[in-house]
Amino acid sequence: MNRLQQRQLFLENLLVGVNSTFHQMQKHSINTCCRSLQRILDHLILLQTIHSPVFRLDRMQLRQMQTLACLWIHQHNHDLQVMSDAIKWISP
């Protein structure tokens, strides 16, 4: 698996994990929802970077992915095709 494929897999796992957790949450205000998503994303990123050294990415890139994941989830209601497009768009 080359680096591009590894990065694609990392992003896919990140977004799918966030999406899955988001579905399990109760309805909240946007602010509460965003704060919850931030904690979820921090946890998922921590798990990925601790257990998969090959996936260690620059912290700024991870923060950018957090923001993009939140935006996509809020704006597109968990649409799988949109999520797939987002993964392709984020990936280099």
UniProtKB/Swiss-Prot annotation:
A Pfam family hit: Rota_NS6
SS bond partners: none
Keywords assigned: Host cytoplasm, Host mitochondrion
Annotated signal peptide: none
Main location: host cell
GO cellular component, one term: host cell mitochondrion
Annotated compartments: Host cytoplasm; Host mitochondrion
HAMAP family: ROTA_NSP6 (MF_04093)
Homology family: Belongs to the rotavirus A NSP6 family.
Subunit structure: Interacts with NSP2 and NSP5.
Protein name: Non-structural protein 6
